[in-house]
Amino acid sequence: MSLVAIGINHKTATVDLREKVAFSPDKIHDAMKSLASRTRSGEAVIVSTCNRTELYCNNGDEADIIAWLEEYHGLDHKDVAPCLYNYHGQDAVRHLMRVASGLDSLILGEPQILGQVKQAFVKAKEAGTVALTIDRLFQNTFSVAKKVRTDTEIGAAAVSVAFAAVSMAKHIFSSISTTKVLLIGAGETIELVAKHLKDNGVASMVVANRTLERAQGMCEEFGATAITLAQIPDYLPKADIVISSTASPLPILGKGMVEKALKQRRHQPMLLVDIAVPRDIEPEVADLDDAFLYTVDDLHSIIEQNMASRKEAAEQAEVITEEQSFLFMDWIRSLESVDSIREYRSQSMAVKDELVERALNKLAQGSDTEQVLIELANRLTNKLIHAPTQALTAASRQGDLNTLGQLRSALGLDKH
C-alpha cells in the first residue's frame, strides 16, 4: 500500500502555470475518475485552488501520475516537471495534514484551505474514487486540522489588512454586531472587509463609492446600502465605524466633515480606519476628541506582531501533524499485517485442501490407510516448512543475524 501526493503551488510555479494545471469545477468529477483509473486501488482526490493543484492517490505510480497530469492538460514534461513536488507514505500524509491546517498556505494559518480540501474530498466521494484508505486519510486530516486550530493560536491573530481592521473594531466595540458601519470604496480590500464584518454579525453596512453601480453590485452580496461619495456627509453621523480604501489622490474625509458628524452624534465615539495609500482621511482627524483614527501603518505593525505569534503557533502545529502522521501510518501497517495474515492462512489452507483431496482419492482407490496418512503428514510438513527453511538458509548464508533471530522468534524456535 503506497500513498502518493504530487502537486504544484504558489511557491514552486508562476500563476500562469498554476492556471494551466488547475481543474475547473465542471471537469474535476471526470478528472478524478480518469486519475483513479491509473491507480491499482482506484482511489484518488484532486485538490485544485488558485494557489495549488495537488493529486492524492493510493497505490499509484509517481511517473504515471505525472504523465497523466501532463496528458490531461496537454503540457510538456519539461515545463511541468521542474515545478512539481512529490511525497510518499508518511511524508504524503504529513503534507496533506499541513495543507489542511494552513501550514503550507500563502497566508500562514488561513482557514479557507480546509474548506477547499473538504470540498475536494466530497467531490471525490461523488465520483466514486474514495475507498477505505483515502477515506480514513482525509477524515483523519480534518480531525488534525481542527485540533491545530483548537490547540494552537494559529488562527487567532489577524494577518491581512482587512482582517486586522475588523479585529481592531471588535476590540474597541463590545458588540460589533450592533454597530453601524460606513465603508468607503468598493475594491477588493473593502469587499474582504465587508465579508469579515458580515461573518461577525454586522447587519448595518453602507458602501460609498465613486461609481454607484460598482457599490450596488457589492451590496447585493452583503445586504448593504449603496451610496455615492457625495452622500457621505448625510450618512457619516450615523456611522460608529468608518473603514476607507479608495484610489483617490486626495482625502475623502476632512477634519471639518468628521467634526460636524461628531457634533450630530452628540460626541459618541467614532472609529475610523484608513487603509488607503495615499490616505483617504486627513491625519488631523486624529486631533478630534471623539475620533479614533488608525492608518494602514498601525495595522501593519499589528499584522507583524500577529505573524510572529502565528509562526510560534505553527511550530506547535508542526508537532501535531508529525505525531498524527505517525499514528496514521501505524494504522496503515496494521492493515498490511491483516492482509499478510489473511494471505498466509489462505495459502496454507489451499495446500491442506490439495493434499487432503489427494489422500482421499488414494483411500477411495483402496490404498493402505496408514501409508496414506503418513504420506499426507510428510507432504504437508514439507510444504509448510519449505518457505521458512529457505528464509532461514538465506539469512544464515548472508550472516544476517538480525533476520535470523526474527525468523527463529517467529517460528517459535527460541522456546525450545
Swiss-Prot record:
Organism: Shewanella baltica (strain OS185)
Protein name: Glutamyl-tRNA reductase
Gene Ontology BP terms: protoporphyrinogen IX biosynthetic process from glutamate
Annotated residues for binding of NADP(+): G185, A186, G187, E188, T189, I190
NCBIfam families: hemA (TIGR01035)
PROSITE patterns: GLUTR (PS00747)
Family: Belongs to the glutamyl-tRNA reductase family.
Pathway membership: Porphyrin-containing compound metabolism; protoporphyrin-IX biosynthesis; 5-aminolevulinate from L-glutamyl-tRNA(Glu): step 1/2
